[in-house]
Amino acid sequence: MAFNPRMSILPPQPQQSRQRKKEEEAAYANMRLPDREIVGCINELGIPFTLADLQKPNPIQVQMIFEWFGELLMNKTRQTVDPAMRAAAEDVCGPELGEAMMPSDTRNLLGFYVSLRRLMLDCGVNDFSFNDLYKPTHDRLVRMLSYVINFVRFRESQTSVIDEHCNKAEQTKARIEQLYVENQNMEAQLEEMRHNRRAMEVLVQEKTVRNEELKKRLLELRRSQEKVAARLEEAKTKKGELAAELEEKTATKIALKQESAKLRPYVLQSPSALQASLAELSNTLNNDKAHIDALDRRSRALQTSTDSFSVVASDVASCIKLLEEIAIELAKEEEENVKNARQRDALTERGHNVREVERTEALLKRQLAKWVDRTAQLRTQSEEKAQKAMEKMEELRAVHRKLTEERSEKGKDIERRRVRIEQTEKKMLDLKENIENEVHAAHDEYLKMEAHIKLYITEMEQAI
């Protein structure tokens, strides 16, 4: 029993290619511009161009036209790609052999071709090749110029949108740079504030330690002041008592002197009585002297105590002055504490500002990281494109080398063929000469044979 194979719903490959080719031809028919319009557009660019130039394109003129379009649309020319291509040539062949093995015109044209190929892909030309620059034809040139001119017209119709996006990109870039500068300034201010905060914390700590020491010293001075005040009051009390006793003794002495003066006339009357009175008076006098000496000693002791009290009073005055200074210092400390509280509040507020700045910084860092990633992606893409360009250049170099080898081989083959042709011609000339000689010889032989035959026939006839 026979089975039919599964039928595919996909059209065969040649049919797909034919459909794609028909679509491309239809799109090209819509995009194709008349030759006169193309020539007019190129003349408007300032490049002299005629219908004859379009019918028979010149590679140098075509390269100039495409270079102008590259500068207009991509800001790329052979001069702009020269540094990168020179560096690539020096990297591949070395700084000494780069210029010799890869001339500047060739490498710059190759580099510009890579950028131009990207532009042509954007314009819709997918089969752009190096031959379109090196060996252009009329149909290919008309097609590429039609696509490029239509792309330029579309770009000019969308100039406002393009300018708007470019301005937005420039504004975003300027804003990023401004935010980066502000971030740097904020970081510097934050570092300065942290430094000031650490310095203020050290000063506050020193002031706190000094305040505690002054408080302890003030308490000790207050205790000493209380002790000195108690001793002063006790000394004042003793001084008052001793002064009252001294006044009492002085009054008693004066009274005794007055009584002695009154009794002196009576004592002179009787010697025995006078003797007795004298003895009594001398005893009294001795007692008074002893008492006066004692009072004198006591007065000196009181004077010493008074001097001591004056010294103590001066010490107390100095202590009071020191206490006043301490009170002033405490007032200053209170003011410093108030200032520290204000500064602490200011630091708290600045801390909030710092947190806000840190949040802003984190946001900016995220944005910066995004831009860095984007830059890295762009750099990676550019490196990949550069690698592809290097690979393409290697392929082109290999193709060039292969073409050079083929050209040299073809030259050698042509030379060999020319030599063979010359040898063949020489042989043919020799053969021609030989054949002519043989023909002449054969003709001579034929004449001889004919003469012999005629002679033979004549002899035969004569014989008959």
Swiss-Prot record:
Keywords: Cell cycle, Cell division, Centromere, Chromosome, Coiled coil, Kinetochore, Mitosis, Nucleus. Gene3D superfamilies: Ncd80 complex, Nuf2 subunit (1.10.418.60). It comes from the Eukaryota. GO terms for cellular component: Ndc80 complex; nucleus. It is found in: Nucleus; Chromosome, Centromere, Kinetochore. GO terms for biological process: attachment of mitotic spindle microtubules to kinetochore; cell division; kinetochore organization; meiotic chromosome segregation; mitotic spindle organization. Residues 159-454 form a coiled coil. Disulfide bonds: none annotated. Residues 1-22 are annotated as: Disordered. GO terms for molecular function: microtubule binding; protein-containing complex binding. Component of the NDC80 complex, which consists of kpr-1/ndc80, kpr-2/nuf2, kpr-3/spc24 and kpr-4/spc25. Belongs to the NUF2 family. Acts as a component of the essential kinetochore-associated NDC80 complex, which is required for chromosome segregation and spindle checkpoint activity. This is Probable kinetochore protein nuf2. It comes from Neurospora crassa (strain ATCC 24698 / 74-OR23-1A / CBS 708.71 / DSM 1257 / FGSC 987). The gene is kpr-2.
